[in-house]
UniProtKB/Swiss-Prot annotation:
This is DNA mismatch repair protein MutL. Residues 356-379 are annotated as: Disordered. Keywords: DNA damage, DNA repair. GO terms for molecular function: ATP binding; ATP hydrolysis activity; ATP-dependent DNA damage sensor activity; mismatched DNA binding. Pfam families: DNA_mis_repair (PF01119), HATPase_c_3 (PF13589), MutL_C (PF08676). Belongs to the DNA mismatch repair MutL/HexB family. The gene is mutL. It comes from Staphylococcus aureus (strain MRSA252). The lineage of its organism: Bacteria, Bacillati, Bacillota, Bacilli, Bacillales. HAMAP family: DNA_mis_repair (MF_00149). This protein is involved in the repair of mismatches in DNA. It is required for dam-dependent methyl-directed DNA mismatch repair. May act as a 'molecular matchmaker', a protein that promotes the formation of a stable complex between two or more DNA-binding proteins in an ATP-dependent manner without itself being part of a final effector complex.
Length: 669
């Protein structure tokens, strides 16, 4: 008797579910994708105990026909594919017909659905089998309830992480779906608490404001670009909002969230020298393309894809991010809280005195405050919850304008309690600002950007409010300032009417010299200085093999290395722009770069050499300068293409506004 036999359907479905349904967030992802594919404009996701107890997804999509209900929980039953060639023209998020079969094999599922001009139906499925099918009252669309996930696979349930971690995974998936489909109203509710609620306006920047907060949303820069095969659209946050991991990079292809090493690399190259090592940007990029150029059927969860013409897409992303930040003022803010312009400035002890009873009254009413630091401590991305939000009187409020500044008026005794009802003006202002941002992003006219930033600067005494503008004269992105002095022989202190500036002198000169060396290394020049006595270098046999392989690359950066017999090589000339007292050391360092990497392209070699030389030749810490030297250094920095970060991505200049300084000394309450 043969040993091979066909598995029972229920067992096969449990095995298949291992790939499709890894955790509660997998269920949310599959059901959310089905709702979007059904044409829903409103989707509600409700979870209890992070989805382990129940997950409910309700949409107003097309619904499921009564005659299709018998097949909906069968494996490989789908309405999205019909023949082989359809697999190469996929525009839906789902297409395999595995999701509902896999979910129903490891959970108890109740599905209610109704189509146009039809009666509703309800079916109950357990262990992959339909146990009940009956007519039911239902609105147009689909209402699916998944309960007792992994009830019949206890081993899987055992490896579920903490409820907090699982909720983070769910929130992450819903957030990304909301970003890629801003035209759909999406709500996520956990144990009765709203975690996310979007308005379906079609504006991605509004969704990002809901997820990351208005502080980040105001610093988003719109990008857009085309090639013959690709169109990209998205938002990239300014470098000061960088994070410690890649989790905040969101890439979509035709609305589908994907992970791709090369596209991540393209984004980081677009931010080149603007981010320090180990820091990653907040960004959203959607790539529209013909489905035939992408294979989405290479990964169980469709997270990884294979792309045609990947290099073309890579260069498009790099160039558009670089263009987004070119000529923009990117002076980072310090970590002090912001203070609205109209708050009281106290000049005497009597003015600063606040009665204890009044303070206690205010504190009792301000029970909860919203803090971006608290949000960032959470493992998931939702930062802007629907809790009652109370703004402290001295906290930064980006929506305070001349028409709503009374919300934090000077009358401290009023004990203003900022509830939802009294917050109508606040959220109205939020909507207006987002709409203005959207109009700005839709325009390629630099004037519209300037107008938006000028409006912001009307409400705050803060030079950073205009830091996102595109300067008409790129060499004037560093504001004029008066040199005050130097701290610890390392930081230059300067001031102007906007406040105080601190400039890292080493980082500033490193940027200046980096751009000089980068341009020189890239030049094809015959300006060579001959050496009276050639420099001799000795290498081991395995080092020789690497050097011989990359001799052409060395020549392209000006190093003419010649074999001199045995393990010896000589250099008899060098480019005239090499610092004369460090020629041998520089050549050694260049060769060591190649020996360490063992795989070097000319672009990376030039980059590494420019960074290395600029770092070696720049002013070090504890080096005291004369005032005219400080002034000359800042003037040279103004001429730089990217004067805000050193080649390693560290900030060069930081601004403390006048009001921030006053707050530090308690002159503003």
């Amino acid at each position: 008797m043969g040993k091979i036999k066909e598995l029972q359907t229920s067992l096969a479905n449990k095995i298949a579910a291992g790939e499709v349904v890894e955790r509660p967030s997998s269920v949310v992802k599959e059901l959310l994708e089905n709702a979007i594919d059904a044409g829903a404009t409103e989707i509600s996701i409700e979870v209890e105990e992070s989805g382990v107890q129940s997950i409910r997804v309700v949409d107003n999509g097309s619904g499921i026909e009564a005659e299709d209900l018998g097949l909906v929980f069968h494996r490989h039953a789908t309405s999205k594919l019909d023949q082989d060639e359809d697999l190469f023209h996929i525009r839906t998020l789902g297409f395999r017909g595995e999701a509902l079969a896999s979910i129903s094999s490891v959970a108890k599922v109740t599905l209610k659905t109704c189509t146009d001009n039809a009666n509703g139906n309800e079916i109950y499925v357990e262990n992959g089998e339909i146990l009940n099918h009956k007519p039911a009252k239902a609105k147009k669309g689909t209402d699916i309830l998944v309960e007792s996930l992994f009830y019949n696979t206890p081993a899987r349930l055992k490896y579920i992480k903490s409820l907090y971690t699982e909720l983070g995974k769910i929130t992450d998936i819903v957030n990304r779906m909301a970003m890629s489909h801003p035209d759909i109203r999406i709500a996520l509710i956990s144990d009765g608490k709203t975690m996310l609620s979007t308005n379906g306006s079609g504006r991605t920047n509004e969704v990002m404001a809901e997820i990351y907060g208005m502080k980040v949303a105001r610093d988003l820069v719109h990008i857009s670009g085309d090639t013959s095969d690709y169109h990209i659209e998205g938002f990239v946050a300014k470098p000061e909002h960088s994070r410690s991991n890649k989790h905040y990079i969101s890439i979509f292809i035709n609305g589908r969230y994907i992970k791709n090493f090369m596209l991540n690399k393209a984004i980081l190259e677009g931010y080149h020298t603007l981010l320090t090592i180990g820091r990653f940007p907040i960004c959203y990029i959607n790539i529209e393309m013909d489905p035939i150029l992408v294979d989405v059927n290479v990964h169980p969860t469709k997270l990884e894809v294979r792309l045609s013409k990947e290099e073309q897409l890579y260069q498009l992303i790099v160039s558009k991010i670089q263009e987004a930040f070119k000529d923009r003022i990117l002076i980072p803010k310090n970590n002090l809280d912001y203070v609205p312009k109209k708050n009281k400035v106290l000049h005497s002890f009597e003015q600063q005195k606040i009665e204890f009873e009044q303070r206690q009254n205010t504190e009792n009413k301000q029970e909860k405050t919203f803090s971006s630091e608290e949000s960032n401590s959470k493992p998931f991305m939702a930062e802007n919850q629907n809790d009652e939000i109370v703004i402290k009187e001295d906290s930064y409020n980006p929506f305070v304008t001349k028409t709503s500044e009374s919300l934090i008026a000077d009358d401290e005794s009023s004990g203003y309690n900022n509830t939802r009802e009294k917050d109508e003006d606040y959220f109205k202002k939020q909507q207006e600002i987002l709409q203005e941002m959207d109009q700005t992003f839709d325009s390629n006219d630099d004037t519209s950007v300037q107008n938006y930033e000028n409006k912001a600067s009307d409400d705050y005494y803060d030079v950073n409010d205009i830091k996102g503008t595109k300067s008409k004269d790129p060499k004037r992105r560093i504001p004029y300032m008066e040199i005050v002095g130097q701290v610890h022989g390392t930081y230059i202190i300067a001031q102007n009417e906007f406040g105080m500036y601190m400039i890292d002198q080493h980082a500033a000169q490193e940027r200046i010299k980096y751009e000089y060396f980068r341009d020189k290394i890239g030049e094809v020049t015959n300006e060579i200085q001959d050496l009276l006595i050639p420099l001799t270098f000795h290498f081991s046999k395995d080092e020789q093999l690497v050097i011989d392989q990359y001799k052409n690359e060395l020549q392209q950066v000006g190093i003419m290395l010649e074999h001199f017999g045995g393990h010896d090589y000589i250099v008899s000339s060098y480019p005239v722009w090499f610092p004369k007292d460090e020629v041998e050391e520089i050549i050694k360092d260049m060769i060591e770069l190649i020996l360490e990497e063992k795989k070097v392209d000319i672009k990376k070699l030039r980059e590494d050499v420019a960074i290395m030389m600029s770092c070696k030749k720049s002013i070090k810490a504890n080096h005291y300068l004369q005032k005219h030297e400080m002034s000359d250094l800042i003037d040279q920095l103004r001429e730089a293409e990217d004067p805000f970060t050193c080649p390693h991505g560290r900030p060069i200049i930081i601004n403390f506004s006048k009001y921030e300084l006053e707050k530090l000394f308690k002159r503003v309450m």
